[in-house]
Design a protein with these regions (language model features):
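N-terminal glycine-rich phosphate-binding loop and ensuing alpha1 helix
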Residues: 2-64
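Short, conserved active-site loop motifs that form the nucleotide-linked donor/cofactor pocket
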Residues: 5, 76-78, 160
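Residue-level signal for inorganic ion chemistry
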Residues: 9, 39, 93, 108-109, ...
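Acidic helix N-cap motif at the loop->helix transition within catalytic regions
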Residues: 64-70
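Short phosphate-binding loop-to-helix
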Residues: 71-104
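Conserved core of the sugar-phosphate nucleotidyltransferase
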Residues: 101, 114-203
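Catalytic beta-strand/loop signature of glycosyltransferases that borders the donor
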Residues: 203-210
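Phosphate-binding loop/pocket of nucleotide- and phosphate-handling active sites
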Residues: 214-227
Length: 227
């Protein structure tokens, strides 16, 4: 089996939750952090590990920001293969890549620009030695409540993890899992959920606090401090 690794960054969303009222409608992944677009930070974090042979960024057709955002980065290409959902975008990027089924694929959120090199190395090391692959994740530390405007119940946090990215799986397995999820109407919020639905148990690899997903307006200020 091959140890070849590529990365896919789905970057076709608009990030509505991260917008301030009245702020220019620049997609979240292109908003500046520490002087550079957030997407550029996310891609550069993947390029920090030389084992990643290429980073493929999937954008929406007509994207007018990506050329400038990623100009000059090595081992990086971008294609207008973004779909209606994250799963569609990743599936489209996989199909467009043409990689062999046994190639390892890292899928990383454009909104996680704080990925530390040691966490990425941990994930790659662990997955190369595993039959399935896995993801970065953090054990839940806070008390977890279920409810809407009022608490309905408190959940047992024992054994609960917060999924992060990258998530790393063989291209063929991931492609088949995403296809099966689409056919069967399985809700896929990350690649691991598709892999789980296909009957596999992905490896949980300790992530990092600074690898949080920039989601809300205040997250930009916090991430600036990390970067």
């Amino acid at each position: 089996m091959s140890d070849s690794i590529i990365a896919i960054v789905p970057a076709a969303g608009v990030g509505a939750r991260a917008s301030h009222p009245g702020v220019e409608s620049v997609p979240k992944q292109y908003r500046p952090l520490a002087g550079q677009p957030m997407l550029r930070h996310a891609v550069a974090a993947l390029l920090a590990d030389e084992r990643v042979s290429q980073v493929r960024v999937a954008v929406t057709p007509g994207d007018g920001w990506v050329d400038q955002a990623l100009a000059g980065l090595p081992r990086t290409v971008w294609r207008a293969c973004g779909g209606a959902t994250r799963a569609d975008t990743v599936a489209g990027a996989l199909a467009e890549s043409g990689v062999a089924d046994d190639t390892w694929v890292l899928v990383h959120d454009a909104a996680r620009p704080g990925l530390p090199a040691p966490a990425l190395a941990r994930l790659i090391d662990a997955c190369l030695a595993d039959a399935v692959g896995g993801l970065l994740a953090l054990p839940v530390a806070d008390t977890v409540k279920a409810g809407h405007d009022r608490v309905e119940r408190t959940l047992d946090r024992n054994g609960l993890w917060l999924a992060q990215t990258p998530q790393m799986f063989r291209a063929g397995v991931l492609r088949d899992a995403l296809t099966a999820a689409a056919v069967n109407g399985v809700a896929v919020t990350d690649e691991a959920s598709a892999i789980e639905a296909a009957g596999y148990a992905p490896l949980l690899v300790p992530g990092a606090m600074r690898n949080f997903k920039v989601t809300w307006p205040d997250d930009f200020e916090l991430m600036e401090k990390w970067l």
